[in-house]
Amino acid sequence: LLSHRSAAVFHDGIRPILPQLVEGHMNRREAGSIAFGLSIGFVASVGISFTLSTGLLNSWLLFLPTDIIGVLAVNVWLAFILGAIWGILVFTSLQPINQLLTSLPVDIIGALGELSNPVVSAFALFPLVAIFYQFGWKQSVVAALLVLLSRLIVVRYFPHLFPESIEIFVGMVLLLGIAIFRDLRDRRTSPTGEEASAPSMFEERTQRIINNLPLIAVTGALISAVASMKIFGGSEVSIYTLAKAYAPGISPEESDALLHQAALAEFMRGLGFIPLIATTALATGVYAVAGFTFVFVVGYLSPSPWLAAPAGAIVITLEILLLRYIGKWLGRYPCLLYTSPSPRD
């Protein structure tokens, strides 16, 4: 429903094309073909491999196909029915497929887990690639050394933390810092008119997201509820830790420690990706299905779905209400508008 209404999608690469669909510059078949091309590779390589190797549902397997379904569907009811069918199909087929693969003489599930390792590492490199793409090799080399240093510190002194989540956070902070420094340096020569025009554009786009707030809040509630049911892992930095926490035979104390470790890794990843998600939302008027992904953290730490659902709805609502203030702050640093799409590219 969210993707059909162009209110929110999971894939950041799809969000910039949805305004073209809303404004009538593109039909659903064209937009759907783009969405399919951008998403199908992640579904096959990340979504399926993560789920089969951990036994947990994940965002890529659930939300990327529903992005495609919603964009292609000709009406709301068709989008709702097909999306529901996909969710039921994925949920009911997970256990039989897992049993089939474990019965084979070859360890396919272990191989799929190894296949996903480079994907996890690649996510951590996104900010560094963005710095190189936007600001050149000198800044990217310095940033790479700082990110490497942060990884060494985490591995050496904080082995309970997921190093890739810290790498993403440090990399995005460096990306933000370099962009803000560039704006402050160039502010004296920049015309003030450009700075004033950005907030007005953000205000218009933010209002479109706020108009879809009830549906987005319901989605946030459902995501948090599912994340609390021990069948779902939100992202690459938490899903394998969650699989260990939910494994049979583990003590409650060890499970709680792993859950908090997964929640912390997810929280750090969410902080790192706030600039990308927020600026894309403000520029397009299309939000992310899971928001800043803090609804995952709420679900991991909630003792029951009944507590997770209202908490998730509140969290994603607060995120949307804060978008207006984030837009005003970002309007002071126009360079961030050009920097934030670089990780997505």
Description of each model-found segment:
Residues 1-49, 69-70:
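N-terminal signal-anchor module of multipass membrane proteins
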Residues 80-89, 141-150, 289-298, 336-337:
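Central hydrophobic cores of alpha-helical transmembrane segments
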Residues 6-21, 104-115, 198, 202-206, ...:
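Hydrophobic alpha-helical segments of integral membrane proteins
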Residues 48-58, 109-121, 262-266:
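Structural signature of hydrophobic alpha-helical transmembrane segments
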Residues 1, 168-283:
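Membrane-embedded hairpin module used as a gating/binding unit in multi-pass transport
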Residues 233-236, 266-329:
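Conserved mixed alpha/beta catalytic, RNA-binding, or beta-rich assembly cores of soluble enzyme
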Residues 103-225:
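Conserved, well-structured core segments that form the ligand-binding/active-site neighborhood
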Residues 338-345:
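Conserved small/polar residues in nucleotide/adenosyl-binding loops
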